[in-house]
Amino acid sequence: MLQNIKHMTLKQLALTMTATILVLSGCAKEMTVNDAVSFLYEYMSIADKGDYSEDFFKANAEVALKARREMPWGKQLNDQLFKHFVLPVRVNNERLDDFRTMYYDTLKARVNGLSMHDAALEINHWCHEKVTYTPSDARTSSPLASMLNGEGRCGEESTFTVAAMRTVGIPARQVYTPRWAHTDDNHAWVEVWTDGKWSFLGACEPEPELNMAWFNEPASRAMLMHTLVFGDYDGPEDVIRRTENFTEINVIGNYVKTRRNIVTVKDSTGNIVTGANVGFCIYNYGEMFPAVTLKTDKNGQASLHTGIGDMFVWASSGGSYGTGLLHTDRAEDCEIVVTLDHNDTEMMDIDIDINPPAPGRIPAEASEAAVAANKLRLAREDSLRLAYTATFTDEVNAAERLGLATEYSDAACKQLIDAKGNWREIREFMVKANDNDLLREGLEMLKTLSRKDIRDTKCDVLLDALISAAKPNFISKNNENIYFDFVLCPRIHGEFLQPFHMDIWNTLAPYIYGNEEANEV
């Protein structure tokens, strides 16, 4: 992994120097695969540099450039749109996979002969055939994992749909409101760039027209909507923050009239405070949620465009804090001064009214005939997806699919059913665990994992963790709960599960066996 990172860092430097020389010499040229890969490596995280090979990113870049050449709308895409909203493989914090390279031909055929606008609508219909909404945990499934199981929460549906749009060269980005202002919870969806402008759609929730979704009215009451753009992006939208890897932008203006909020922070003596933290908070789930935190500039100010509703402000610096309320029902600048007049160990009682934006209207037009036709399509797409999910393991066929005569058959069958589209990998794992006389331990290990883990983890990853946990015979197994939860369990937090356990075991084993201190543990 470290060698891979070092190799790619040196290669990235060489490619960047070459590109700089070409620019300085005035030799503008069409983007090449090397240019595209260089851009990806310039801004990707160190984890992605280590987890995925150069060939992986090269293959994805080749397909992205192919889409730009072959799709009729490719000529509309300038380099900025292409680099930031088509080329990147990553959408959120999902595991990267081969979705783009596997499904380019399929999706290209699906949109053949369509305009860019109609292609975006059609891709969303395809996504609906494959995935529907189901709540789950915070870890984001990859596009192929969502397809495998036919389901995903809104963040996974939107990750999947963005990947599909980008595959055919349609610029797309995942947009989310960190918290609704008028009700609890949040939501994520997709924006697509078609024919010169950004429009929104509900991911895997196709409508007959863009800018139509079940959340049109909720969106009209939102205070903030933002998206993470891969790389150092300099577009027309407000920038919330820049990092080495991405640019966070505010796109609330695409949905509602906005106001500019200006917060000036002063200390208890009236002097402006630079570098203070200013949290712009939305009331949700019984808390003041810091949707955005900014630093004050040299004038002691921080500003943010939002919807037209109340917003609580929390400012802090140097062990002191203060609060304020942004309130106006008009699309005009709203300015307040927050004084840091409380010590951070001091409790504070606050009695305020928080008013969300009033319901508005986001225009969306579709004829009654188009709406009726869309409903028929949705029903057909549901039937296609349900026909696929009907192939998953159930109580009727579980024992036959398992094919093991064991006292643990009931528990093993339950895991096959829970595995949904991943049942073949889980079956292979249990068969191999049984071959190693470790089926009981394997089933206990599966019980430590989330349902999502069961539904997208490969056999080799699970078997690697199981075999390595069974190796150290000096570990006391008298307290099985501790052994199962803290030795056998392959997951630590939200990391990608990888087959690394045996590598570590083979490295450390020579230092452990024969070591009396280790044997006393």
Can you say where each PLM-predicted feature lies in the sequence?
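C-terminal motif of bacterial Sec signal peptides marking the signal peptidase cleavage site
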Residues: L24-G26
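Hydrophobic/aromatic-rich core segments of domains that either
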Residues: K29, A109-R110, L114, A119-H125, ...
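Secondary-structure boundary elements
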Residues: K29-N149, D184-D185, T406-V521
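Extracellular beta-sheet/turn segments enriched in Thr/Pro/Gly and aliphatic residues
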Residues: R242-N254, H327-E368
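A short, amphipathic beta-strand motif
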Residues: R259-G270
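Short, ordered, surface-exposed loop/turn motifs in non-cytosolic proteins
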Residues: S268-E287, I308-D310
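Short, acidic Ser/Thr/Gly-rich low-complexity loop/linker segments typical of extracellular
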Residues: N284-T306
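Short Pro-Gly-centered beta-turn/loop motif in secreted/extracellular proteins
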Residues: Q301-V313, S317-S320, H327-R330
